[in-house]
């Protein structure tokens, strides 16, 4: 199964594509969609087109996207929601089922700790996918979203279920921290 993860943002939208076979995760691609400094409609169109292109190029079976959190600034929350909507439209237009996860669910599934930092997310994504270098934070979050979705439907959905995959890489989670 191929999963496309999306970390939505108005300026930068991260994406990550992984293949899942049983409990094995394999990196396919990741990166960002950058929007131009332009009016809102142009930026949203760029996100929609970028996501639509990813769906055509990588032919994922499913997609996962982060839910909007309520920010201190209501305007920022509204703009993020619109960017997320443009990304979802690109996914749905490509015929994909779309799952949604909170940031807490994402961090819990990938790191085993709901308050994990960006650097902890990047490190864990790098290790789980055997990457030679760390992806940027937006791409790492998107890859994490795909990993979270892969774990949601089976025993890998809990940190105890992650134990075999971590052990193969010489790692374990102790009190919310990655120990290796």
Swiss-Prot record:
Record's cofactor remark: Binds 2 Mg(2+) ion per subunit.
UniProt cofactor(s): Mg(2+)
UniProt KW keywords: Cytoplasm, DNA damage, DNA recombination, DNA repair, DNA-binding, Endonuclease, Hydrolase, Magnesium, Metal-binding, Nuclease
Residues that bind Mg(2+) 2: 66
Catalysed reactions, semicolon-separated: Endonucleolytic cleavage at a junction such as a reciprocal single-stranded crossover between two homologous DNA duplexes (Holliday junction)
Gene3D superfamilies named among the record's database cross-references: Ribonuclease H-like superfamily/Ribonuclease H
Annotated GO biological process: DNA recombination; DNA repair
EC number: 3.1.21.10
Active-site residues annotated for this sequence: 7, 66, 138
Name of one Pfam family that matches: RuvC
Localization (cell): Cytoplasm
Chain residues that bind Mg(2+) 1: 7, 138
GO molecular function: crossover junction DNA endonuclease activity; DNA binding; magnesium ion binding
Stored InterPro entries: RNaseH-like_sf (IPR012337), RNaseH_sf (IPR036397), X-over_junc_endoDNase_Mg_BS (IPR020563), X-over_junc_endoDNase_RuvC (IPR002176)
Main subcellular location: cytoplasm
Matches recorded under CDD domains: RuvC
Protein's job: The RuvA-RuvB-RuvC complex processes Holliday junction (HJ) DNA during genetic recombination and DNA repair. Endonuclease that resolves HJ intermediates. Cleaves cruciform DNA by making single-stranded nicks across the HJ at symmetrical positions within the homologous arms, yielding a 5'-phosphate and a 3'-hydroxyl group; requires a central core of homology in the junction. The consensus cleavage sequence is 5'-(A/T)TT(C/G)-3'. Cleavage occurs on the 3'-side of the TT dinucleotide at the point of strand exchange.
Subunit record text: Homodimer which binds Holliday junction (HJ) DNA. The HJ becomes 2-fold symmetrical on binding to RuvC with unstacked arms; it has a different conformation from HJ DNA in complex with RuvA. In the full resolvosome a probable DNA-RuvA(4)-RuvB(12)-RuvC(2) complex forms which resolves the HJ.
Protein name per the record: Crossover junction endodeoxyribonuclease RuvC
Organismal lineage: Bacteria, Pseudomonadati, Pseudomonadota, Betaproteobacteria, Burkholderiales
Gene responsible for this protein: ruvC
């Amino acid at each position: 199964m191929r999963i496309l993860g999306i970390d939505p943002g108005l300026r930068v939208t991260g994406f990550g594509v992984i293949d899942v076979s049983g409990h094995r995760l394999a990196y396919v691609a990741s990166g960002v969609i950058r929007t131009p400094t332009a009016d809102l409609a142009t930026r949203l169109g760029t996100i929609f087109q970028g996501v639509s292109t990813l769906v055509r190029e990588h032919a994922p079976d499913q997609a996962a996207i982060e839910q909007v959190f309520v920010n201190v600034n209501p305007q920022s929350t509204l703009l993020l929601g619109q960017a997320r909507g443009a990304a979802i439209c690109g996914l749905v237009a490509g015929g994909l089922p779309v799952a949604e996860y909170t940031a807490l669910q994402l961090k819990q599934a990938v790191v085993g700790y709901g308050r994990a930092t960006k650097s902890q997310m990047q490190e864990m994504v790098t290790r789980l996918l055997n990457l030679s270098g760390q992806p940027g934070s937006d791409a790492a979050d998107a890859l994490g979203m795909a990993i979270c979705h892969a774990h949601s439907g089976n025993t890998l959905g809990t940190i105890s279920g992650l134990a075999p995959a971590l052990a193969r890489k010489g790692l374990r989670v102790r009190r919310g921290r990655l120990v290796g």
